Amino acid sequence: MAFFDTGYFKGNKPRSLLAKKRNIKNKITAWGLGKQYYDGNRLDGYGGYKYDGRWKKFLPKIIKKYKLSGKSKVLDLGCKKGFFLKDLRDLIPGIKIHGIENHYYPIQHAHKNVKKYLSFSNYYNLKFKNKHFDLVFAFNSIYSQNL
């Protein structure tokens, strides 16, 4: 598949500045991908990972590119708290969504409008038939896997 740039935003400060402030304790805390990573100090991870509707700005390009409609089925692999899927459902009523996350904390603290569509699993041997989904979205998840 060819590269597709959604225009996803870039921060106003270089990430390297934050990386220089992180110490080994921050990195070990982040590695756990739990409460401190998602909702703790910014040096430990996301630092207050709360819903802000940011995907609504980028989703129209994705919707158009992949011709998504209310009849489409979308899997978000590495869905975190489900914010991508929440915004997708807001923009396309009726769309079938499912999120897979390999850490419990973000699912337990997922957005209430999509929580029931999220499940815990590793990213291998998923129990879906081939071509079940019209789009599999894997933002910030594949890089962490041993492929």
Model-based region annotation:
Residues M1-I28:
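N-terminal auxiliary segments of SAM/dcSAM-dependent transferases
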Residues G40-R54:
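Class I SAM-dependent methyltransferase Rossmann-like catalytic core
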Residues D52-S69:
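Conserved alpha-helix/loop element of class I SAM-dependent methyltransferases that forms part
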Residues K71-K80:
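Conserved class I S-adenosyl-L-methionine
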Residues F83-N125:
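Class I SAM-dependent methyltransferase SAM/SAH-binding core
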Residues F137:
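A conserved beta-strand element that flanks and buttresses the S-adenosyl-L-methionine
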Residues N140-S141:
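Short catalytic micro-motifs in class I SAM-dependent methyltransferases
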Residues Q145-L147:
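A short, conserved alpha-helix within the catalytic core of class I
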